[in-house]
């Protein structure tokens, strides 16, 4: 995967029974991961403040049709009859809408074509995050989002504000081709899945 043309979006969905062990989901403004050389450390900087401004809209079932259609197509493309993948269409949809918010022109049109041409992908994602992220007596559901941006790029503040306020997302700046960045991303996933997913990324992103 090429790092120079990609902002890496991580979205996790966690469903656990309340009898399971619960970890601390809080995060600091920076994540420092030791490198193989104990005398050096690489710092991953958080670019966003955690400020959630929810948009609660009384959506009808028809409003969620783009999400349902996206989920069906995602499973259709992923199931080949020989494997049994674990997929979260909601996580994939939210991650893509986060990325789509930073696009414009023809690229933005492609995101809308994929995610539903209703012009409301941002508020729809925000509504799902707020509706679904509630604990019940026997169930805990957690949606967590983050964006990892290579340090050769400077993201627009407007996009950072959007993903922070509407997606409750954190954005991190790092050299994505380093093992330290890979370790930090894996640690983020581990922390936000209460240790159920310990390693999502097997190797650093390609520097070219």
Where are these regions (language model features)?
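Active-site-proximal helix/loop microenvironment
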Residues: 85-92, 96-103, 200-208
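Active-site-surrounding "flap" and adjacent substrate/cofactor-binding loops of secreted or lumenal enzymes
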Residues: 52, 101-133
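Non-catalytic, conformational "gating/processing" segments within enzyme and secreted inhibitor domains
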Residues: 34, 38-41, 82, 125-208
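Bacterial N-terminal signal peptides that target proteins for export
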Residues: 1-9
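C-terminal motif of bacterial Sec signal peptides marking the signal peptidase cleavage site
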Residues: 17-21
